[in-house]
Amino acid sequence: MKNLFVLLVITILLSACSPETSEENATPIGDWRHHGGNHNSDKYAPLDQIEGGNFSELEVAWRYRSPDLDLPKDLAYPTGDYRAVPLVVNGIMYVNSNHGLISALDSATGKELWVFDPKSYELGPPLFFPLQTRGIEYWTDGEIERIFIATSGKQLVSVDIHTGLPDPNFGNNGYVDLKQNFGRLEFEMNNITHGAPPIAVGSTVIVGSKIYDFSMINRSPPGHVRAYDAYTGDFKWRFNTIPQAGEFGNETWENDSWRVTGNTNVWTYMSADEEAGIVYLPTSTPTNDYWGGFRLGENLFAESIVALDIETGERIWHFQTVHHGVWDYDVASAPNLVDIEVDGKAIKAIAQVSKTAFTYVFDRITGEPVWPIEERPVAQSDIPGERLHPTQPFPTKPAPFDRQGISEDDLIDFTPEIAETAREMAKEYVLGPIFTPPIVRGSNGKRSTFVVPGAGGGANFPGATVDPETGIIYIPSATLPHGMGLVAPPAGTSDWPYTIQMDTQIGPFGLPLLKPPYRRITAIDLNTGEHVWQIPFGKGPADHPMLEHLDLPPLGSVFSDVVAEGGVLITKTLLISYLAQRDEIDPEAHGSILVAHDKMTGELLGEVLVDQRLHGPPMSYQVGDKQYIAVAGGGRDDDNELLVFALPN
């Protein structure tokens, strides 16, 4: 009876929704069907009811308390920042919790229609604490409609969007065991889990993985990517991100290191060109992120963009952004697909932003760079057993969107006292251009290599946003430098000769060591490769006691407690993001500030104070004649909730 009622409610809501469709991605205008809005991952909502003149009037229309908070305490695990991306399909919202529960909601009121619980907590503790699940995937063939989720319990689940029940025709009553069909088995299976959503195109569901980065023992699993039949759950193919014997790229792992190396996984979001039948994989660094002496060679397909045939898993093209990485420069976000015109030539393009602060732009069908990418010599390591690649790829266009490398000229110098202290502190570190290698702590009297951007800096997992109408890409970034020093682990604790020790929050008098800006948003026209505008994002430490008399402009937020937050959303006229009140107003403040800029100029147009700390990527949708903005927030204090904003009636 309850299911009949749910179906009736859904039917009524469907009748109220506009059938109008956006030409760019075949998604009905007003819907948000995938984590990035569509499989292009453009994060663009072609809506304009909320605009610069009324943005500051936004108020919370409704809130949805995470069902995680109702789980029995003896079953639930501590959860992290709530970063889920809600989906809206024909007026119904679907959103996951950190424990992987899926809720269907009336997207106009927040009324709960159903909740599905995969009960992954019954399968043992999660690999990563606190627990976090970042999204779900919607799939339809035009008749059947499903939600897919990859859980922390190593399950792929198919849920009927109308009933909230597992699909009995998929796998074992709706569940596929992701511990199977992985290939190499001589590793620690407990070191792998899932957090980002799968991607489903055609009749195929593709699943990445989340693997622990700092294992002290070399038994991490390889990050092979697997695909399943969307109807039956049958295993379809596996792409070995670490090529096995006889496969292309296997020779880039010297001394048979491919047999024992792990990671090189796809832990973040993926994108796909549905018409071309291509899925794009952003891959991570191989095991031991910071020392590669046992895995000499280029190490394909680590830190790469890999284009695969969706139906077969065959490699079409790839590009490695970092050869033999030792900086933890994962390709950390979904690439953006956009059609551009360069020198009169139409190009179906793909743009990949990175932790390195480079933007790599290619023809997404052929893999040809839109502008030349040059292999340039880089500094080499003097660590015994290590051999770095002699060159690294440098795009000639666009210019970097954040600081790269460090010299004395980059040190903070607002006052003579600050400048002198910064210079003295910098003497403890190796300074140099991007790709300066880590050192063994204490070498030549230095603590570590000062790496800029750091592993959490540049563009991280929120990635970029691209306007399909103009070809302008918007990139939120942070400098976030840190010191990388290698140390010998205590006897008997590791089979690595070196593990990493990080030096963080380095700087004089509680200030950053570098000059601002510390966080920024950059707009780049992908038709020309030129920067359109760049702004510091956030006030930063302008009110520091040693700076407050200088009346400084915004310096960019210093990210007081996180490496990356939710990224940016664009609409017809706006660029929307948020800042933490503790960075902008008061160190003791709890909430956030929802912020809107003019997307063509970067001009600040409006702000809204929010009484919750926001963490998830913002998205926007429309039901009937009303536009909404939704963001997930809370999480560490048993306050996980979804906040939905709208203009007053």
Regions found by a protein language model. Name each.
Residues 18-20:
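Bacterial signal peptide processing site
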Residues 39-142, 147-179:
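N-terminal cofactor/phosphate-binding cores enriched in small/glycine residues
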Residues 64-85, 115-141, 172-197, 212, ...:
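Extracytoplasmic beta-rich repeat domains
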Residues 334-383, 634, 644-647:
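Phosphate/diphosphate-binding loops
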Residues 159, 163-164, 221-234, 295-314, ...:
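Beta-propeller blade signature
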Residues 13-16:
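C-terminal motif of bacterial Sec signal peptides marking the signal peptidase cleavage site
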